[in-house]
């Protein structure tokens, strides 16, 4: 059950981090209170609950493993008292965790405009490896290219943090640097394809597994979770 909870717990933590940057939401119901002290807050309450229930499950796992190698000639009450608490309660906890997780997935939402702004803000930094490769393809030495890119990247990052410059100027500044072999237009072309690696392949693999499970368990496809208190 701890292993089963690890996926929802990890995603819940990721969503909490993303929500901190206003990228996503788990849904905020009418009448829900995010914080009794700060009325504006819309805390990821359900994701926080998933994290807490995962900790509870790990606690029960710790209780049960403490019985390992600690019995005398036979089991006794010191063993059964732990089992009687940990075993049934673990099922209650994993049930509540999964009910909550399904609700989070059902009510999940994202904010594309905020995501686009963040992508535009950080994409030049995330693409410095591509920029470095493009410079090498132009015949520039690796160490020299690395140093120039680092120089402008640090300057751009500090400008974004300390001034009202607004836009990430890394590509503009690199393109204007006579020491660097690419123009701003060439740099934009070099990073135009956002690198997502094997993400699409992984999505397709997971989707195929889900479809197989749906074929096997038809009733699960339309399951409606119990209301969250």
Spans of model-derived segments:
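Acidic, glycine-rich loop-and-beta core segments that form the ion-binding/anion-interacting portion
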Residues: 1-61
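Glycine-rich cofactor/substrate-binding loops
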Residues: 23, 40-229
């Amino acid at each position: 059950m701890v292993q089963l909870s690890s996926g929802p717990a990890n995603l819940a933590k990721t969503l909490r981090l993303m929500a901190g940057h206003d990228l996503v939401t788990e849904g905020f119901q009418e009448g829900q209170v995010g914080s009794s002290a700060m009325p504006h807050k819309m805390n990821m309450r359900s994701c926080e609950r998933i994290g807490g229930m995962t900790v509870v499950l790990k606690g029960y796992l710790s209780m049960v493993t403490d019985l390992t190698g600690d019995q005398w000639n036979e089991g006794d009450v010191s063993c059964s008292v732990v089992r009687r608490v940990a075993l049934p309660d673990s099922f209650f906890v994993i049930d509540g965790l999964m009910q909550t997780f399904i609700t989070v997935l059902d009510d999940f939402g994202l904010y594309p405009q905020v995501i686009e702004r963040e992508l535009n803000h950080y994409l030049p930094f995330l693409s410095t490896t591509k920029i470095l490769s493009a410079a090498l393809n132009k015949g520039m030495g690796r160490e020299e290219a690395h140093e120039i890119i680092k120089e402008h990247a640090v300057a751009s990052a500090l400008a974004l943090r300390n001034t009202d410059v607004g836009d990430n100027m890394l590509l503009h500044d690199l393109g204007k640097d006579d020491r660097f072999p690419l123009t701003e237009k060439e740099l934009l072309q070099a990073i135009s394809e956002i690198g997502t690696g094997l993400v699409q392949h992984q999505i397709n693999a997971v989707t195929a597994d889900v479809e197989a499970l749906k074929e096997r368990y038809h009733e699960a496809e339309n399951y409606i979770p119990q209301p969250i208190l």
